[in-house]
Amino acid sequence: MATHKLLLLPGDGIGTEVMAEVSRLIDWLNKAGIASFETEHGLVGGAAYDADKVAITDATMALAQASDAVIFGAVGGPKWDAVPYDARPEAGLLRLRKDLALFANLRPAVCYPALAEASSLKPEVVEGLDIMIVRELTGGVYFGEPKTITDLGNGQKRAIDTQVYDTYEIERIGRVAFDLARKRRNKVTSMEKRNVMKTGVLWNEVITQVHAREYKDVQLEHQLADSGGMNLVKWPKQFDVIVTDNLFGDMLSDIAAMLTGSLGMLPSASLGAVDDTTGKRKAMYEPVHGSAPDIAGKGLANPVAMLASFGMALRYSLDMGELADKLDEAIAVVLARGLRTADIKSEGSTVVSTSQMGEAIVQEMQALHG
């Protein structure tokens, strides 16, 4: 049995609480002989700043480079609002993405049958929802230069952010989306703003070319990003895989998240390119939710997104798809049984703490393994 090296980065706020439930699951998998994991732990975000005055140390980055997968919690909080910009907690996350060359962000939006009532939309609109949003992660306006604020000297300031995309960046994210669609329902929707942005014109052109050359068997459609956001709310089940740039992907994935009822339910994966020699890729897995400092330490956090993120690591980095399927099933069974953390509680449900939810999911995994 191969041993997989994992780096666990809990981060700040509820990150430590939800990561504890991943550790619980890993410990059980190791003890049961189902899998073999070797784990390292590191600081990131505000926790790293408090210890080392940086958002992530070079030593922790070296551990990330050497791991088969990075499992990331959440960073940030009001405590660090006044720290230098380059050392802000979010800078640790951005460095991980950039140094590991994690260009593809996968955000599934899945509505479990037991939670259709938790959505703000009608149950029939979201029941059975299963969307994958593929967001380009290392280009666009978040990384483009120049990025400045200039004092104009007349009591005014000017801020500049730069949206930049090259052909190869669009090609590789397009291929990720098309490859995923082939394993799902064979449809890709590309979203941009070609009506007002030159990067949108290029994005549309390149995605169309990649489709024509390599993926004619996959259905492709284009939507403007603002219209696409409207359609996500109006008729979300029309979508299978959505591919879009960094900025729009950030927004659209949060819209999709709330279709499911809670940010606490949604995982994500950030993937690098496949190494031609090893066949492996750098990858990081994290919940979509933030550090939620207002509920940190109270046992209220929902660990499902964190556990589901670990499930994505099993599927996309560790070649353990069957185990990932069982984890998905365990989560669904526990929810169907009526267990809920506070963020997804409903009439007649049993409200449980972070650790109780994590323990219930691990117990269900045990039952599924006989």
Swiss-Prot record:
Gene3D superfamilies: Isopropylmalate Dehydrogenase
Pathway: Amino-acid biosynthesis; L-leucine biosynthesis; L-leucine from 3-methyl-2-oxobutanoate: step 3/4
Catalysis: reaction(s): (2R,3S)-3-isopropylmalate + NAD(+) = 4-methyl-2-oxopentanoate + CO2 + NADH
Alphabetical list of SMART domains matching this protein: Iso_dh
Keywords: Amino-acid biosynthesis, Branched-chain amino acid biosynthesis, Cytoplasm, Leucine biosynthesis, Magnesium, Manganese, Metal-binding, NAD, Oxidoreductase
Molecular function, one GO term: 3-isopropylmalate dehydrogenase activity
Family according to the record: Belongs to the isocitrate and isopropylmalate dehydrogenases family. LeuB type 1 subfamily.
Description of how the protein assembles with itself and partners: Homodimer.
Entry protein name: 3-isopropylmalate dehydrogenase
